[in-house]
Amino acid sequence: MVAQRTFVMIKPDGVKRGLIGEIISRFEKRGLKIVSLKMVKMSRDTAEKLYEEHKGKSFFEELVNYVTSGPVVCMVIEGDDVVQVIRRMIGNTDPKEAPPGTIRGDYALSKSENVIHASDSIEKAQREMSLFFDKSDL
């Protein structure tokens, strides 16, 4: 199997609550490789690009305001079938639907403060990585 790369972002509530190390540890224990990592304060423009598929939805403004409210940790993670592996590890967007043992099941406070974002396809991962990382970072 060929290793793939995906984009993962620890959201402001995860950073503020000191969950960065715990989340990274889960990925590393699963045998995934952190290729690049940075903490940033996301601009509104970047947030709107990151979540462009939600533009026009009722929660879009709240989401953009939330992810720009504090620092986030952006990562490029590599591994076999990494997109699906990480999607399973993070759990459902709604923490009530996320089983215990998943990142959101264990740490998310609400649908909006759900600790983490991860790309849901290779195509989206490539687009999302390019918002935060130059080719030289990878």
Swiss-Prot record:
Keyword Nucleotide-binding: yes
EC numbers: 2.7.4.6
Disulfide feature: none
Record-annotated active site: 117 (pros-phosphohistidine intermediate)
CDD domains for the chain: NDPk_I
Swiss-Prot/TrEMBL catalytic activity: a 2'-deoxyribonucleoside 5'-diphosphate + ATP = a 2'-deoxyribonucleoside 5'-triphosphate + ADP; a ribonucleoside 5'-diphosphate + ATP = a ribonucleoside 5'-triphosphate + ADP
Cofactor: Mg(2+)
GO CC terms, sorted: cytoplasm
Protein localization: Cytoplasm
Pfam family, one: NDK
Key words of the record: ATP-binding, Cytoplasm, Kinase, Magnesium, Metal-binding, Nucleotide metabolism, Nucleotide-binding, Phosphoprotein, Transferase
GO molecular function ontology, one term from the record: metal ion binding
UniProt-listed GO biological process terms: CTP biosynthetic process; GTP biosynthetic process; UTP biosynthetic process
Sequence positions that bind ATP: 11, 59, 87, 93, 104, 114
Alphabetical list of SUPFAM superfamilies matching this protein: Nucleoside diphosphate kinase, NDK (SSF54919)
InterPro entries registered for this protein in UniProt: NDK-like_dom, NDK-like_dom_sf, Nucleoside_diP_kinase, Nucleoside_diP_kinase_AS
Its job: Major role in the synthesis of nucleoside triphosphates other than ATP. The ATP gamma phosphate is transferred to the NDP beta phosphate via a ping-pong mechanism, using a phosphorylated active-site intermediate.
Assigned protein family: Belongs to the NDK family.
NCBIfam families membership: PRK00668.1
Record's protein name: Nucleoside diphosphate kinase
Origin species: Saccharolobus solfataricus (strain ATCC 35092 / DSM 1617 / JCM 11322 / P2)
